[in-house]
């Protein structure tokens, strides 16, 4: 459906209108033809909109008012940890000594920034129970891939070239099998048992001499803690494999439990989730990777070291997998995460987990009478419901999500994990008040009653948004990803 009341920026163009004027040329003019080969020079002008600065401001301000973010409302996306990002993070990230430096500066001139990076690494080592950390990876999936490449390098250095398989649970994040594939591994699925945890017998069945690693989130994507994690680690390690920790759900165990103490060999973190770097909208993110001692030689170079003369980057890493990102990671997000960790302290981080778990369990118990609860036990930071009973009445989980838009809420994650029918995954985080949770819960209960009494209201939702229902089939099969200038009218 076309958005009728908000013209595209291309549709408000007026030939000859400008938004910015360049100063008069005060140097000798250089022709493009004298600098670039003809293959690199446009034959026709780019079809850019011709608009004033005021046009631009009003257009994008109007669009921004339709966006939904953590600062504007509740954002209960499961497995995304959409917590409030403290604004002190932004103030610190804008310090001139952080914002105005360049990665190609001499190390002697950026010792303060390097000290922050080193201290952040030390904090993450303590939080995760790993032996060292690299800040290079730029996001969660990037961290996954980096960690898997480290595992691959480790096995190959030990002559284990036949370890070509990575095991992932059927409840795993979709990035896990994708990262394994990109890293050159074959993915093997291990089933969950009736309690929503990894089936140990199935794990024993699939682990063998070809196993490179088991990728695991703990608590898992169902919001359940893998209580047999020590036995799982023993199974994998006895077979010569490594245990990989997907840090997407670390918010559930901060200062309560550490991946390193559970037997994990590699961990990636999402600083843009757990440690309040703003996320959503494409980035930037930060996905540091921590490892145990036997994987340190393969970490991407350079690594940051502290000596009696200060901080420096060590490039002398003959066994390293190489670089995984230009320079040293997304520094601005690292500054925000460091600020958050120092502001909270160990007791504050422990409270983060306590309130995140409390909020999730409160919501789960209040909603359980109205939606199916696949796993009736205490959850951690998130939980899953099922819309199976609503589906029997002709209303899909997608319809429920659309109906929530009418009340100003961003919908939860739906249809994931894949092993729960009509899945609704909710993560409230620790930063939401009871009043906010109750408001959302009340609307979820209202929707459940509407399904029983007046299902058409839910099936046809949303009713109050500017854009209603999209043709999802056409959007998937024939997406319109760029503006096409209308053909000139023939007269």
Curated annotation (Swiss-Prot):
GO terms for biological process: glycine decarboxylation via glycine cleavage system. GO terms for cellular component: cytosol; glycine cleavage complex. Signal peptide: none annotated. Its EC number is 1.4.4.2. It is an enzyme of class 1 (oxidoreductase). It catalyses: N(6)-[(R)-lipoyl]-L-lysyl-[glycine-cleavage complex H protein] + glycine + H(+) = N(6)-[(R)-S(8)-aminomethyldihydrolipoyl]-L-lysyl-[glycine-cleavage complex H protein] + CO2. The keyword Calcium does not apply. NCBIfam families: PRK04366.1. The glycine cleavage system catalyzes the degradation of glycine. The P protein binds the alpha-amino group of glycine through its pyridoxal phosphate cofactor; CO(2) is released and the remaining methylamine moiety is then transferred to the lipoamide cofactor of the H protein. Belongs to the GcvP family. C-terminal subunit subfamily. This is Probable glycine dehydrogenase (decarboxylating) subunit 2. It comes from Bacillus cereus (strain G9842).
């Amino acid at each position: 459906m076309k958005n009728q009341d908000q013209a595209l920026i291309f549709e408000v163009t007026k030939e000859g209108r400008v938004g910015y004027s360049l100063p008069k040329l005060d140097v000798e003019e250089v022709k493009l033809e004298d600098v670039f080969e003809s293959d690199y020079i446009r034959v026709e002008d780019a079809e850019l909109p011709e608009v004033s600065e005021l046009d631009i401001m009003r257009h994008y301000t109007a669009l921004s008012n339709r966006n939904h973010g953590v600062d504007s409302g509740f954002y209960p996306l499961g497995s995304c940890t959409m917590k409030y990002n403290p604004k002190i993070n932004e103030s610190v990230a804008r310090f001139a000594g952080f914002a105005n430096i360049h990665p190609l500066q001499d190390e002697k001139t950026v010792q303060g920034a390097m000290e922050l990076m080193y201290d952040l690494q030390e904090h993450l080592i303590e939080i995760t129970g790993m032996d060292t950390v690299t800040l290079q990876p730029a996001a969660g999936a990037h961290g996954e891939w980096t960690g898997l490449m480290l595992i691959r390098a480790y096995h190959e250095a030990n002559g284990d070239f036949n370890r070509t398989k990575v095991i992932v649970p059927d409840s795993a994040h979709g990035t896990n099998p994708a990262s394994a594939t990109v890293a050159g591994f074959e993915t093997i699925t291990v089933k969950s048992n009736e309690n929503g945890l990894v089936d140990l017998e199935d794990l024993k069945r699939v682990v063998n001499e070809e196993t490179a690693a088991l990728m695991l989130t703990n608590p898992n994507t169902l919001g359940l803690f893998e209580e047999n994690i020590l036995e799982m680690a023993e199974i994998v390690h006895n077979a010569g494999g490594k245990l990989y920790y997907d840090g997407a759900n670390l918010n559930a165990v901060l200062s309560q439990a550490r991946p390193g103490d559970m037997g994990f060999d590699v961990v990636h973190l999402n600083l843009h989730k757990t440690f309040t770097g703003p996320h959503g909208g494409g980035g930037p993110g930060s996905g540091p990777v921590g490892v145990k001692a036997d994987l340190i030689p393969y970490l991407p170079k350079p690594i940051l070291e502290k000596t009696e003369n200060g901080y420096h980057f060590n490039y002398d890493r003959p066994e390293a997998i190489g670089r995984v990102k230009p320079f040293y990671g997304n520094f601005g997000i690292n500054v925000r995460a460091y600020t958050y960790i120092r502001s909270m302290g160990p007791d504050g981080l422990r409270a983060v987990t306590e309130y995140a778990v409390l909020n999730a369990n409160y919501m789960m118990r209040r909603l359980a009478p109205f939606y199916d609860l696949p796993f009736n036990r205490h959850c951690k930071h998130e939980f899953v419901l099922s819309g199976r009973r609503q589906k029997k009445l002709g209303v899909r989980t997608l319809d429920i999500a659309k109906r929530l838009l009418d009340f100003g809420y961003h919908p939860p994650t739906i249809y994931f994990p894949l092993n729960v029918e009509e899945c609704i995954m909710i993560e409230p985080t620790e930063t939401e008040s009871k009043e906010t949770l109750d408001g959302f819960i009340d609307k979820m209960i209202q929707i459940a009653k509407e399904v029983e009494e007046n299902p058409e209201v839910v099936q046809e939702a949303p009713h109050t948004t500017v854009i209603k229902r999209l043709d999802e089939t056409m959007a998937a099969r024939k997406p319109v990803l760029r503006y096409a200038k209308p053909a000139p009218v023939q007269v």
